[in-house]
Amino acid sequence: MPFVKIDLFEGRSQEQKNELAREVTEVVSRIAKAPKENIHVFINDMPEGTYYPQGELKKK
């Protein structure tokens, strides 16, 4: 049962996230030979000011 977690800065529309989830599901199903009904995609909208690579605030 594949679980796919995607972290994105917030700002994408619901339509964009829906399309992303559908496309990711298709690819995972094809490559991992997993039934689509067993694939779970989680999209996390990260607010600006919450990402610190190498300890430094990263902005969009």
Swiss-Prot record:
InterPro entries: 4-OT-like_dom, Tautomerase/MIF_sf. Gene3D superfamilies: Macrophage Migration Inhibitory Factor. The keyword Nuclease does not apply. It is an enzyme of class 5 (isomerase). GO terms for molecular function: isomerase activity. Keywords: Isomerase. The active site is at P2. Its EC number is 5.3.2.-. Coiled coil: none annotated. The keyword Ribosomal protein does not apply. Belongs to the 4-oxalocrotonate tautomerase family. This is Probable tautomerase SAG1079. It comes from Streptococcus agalactiae serotype V (strain ATCC BAA-611 / 2603 V/R).
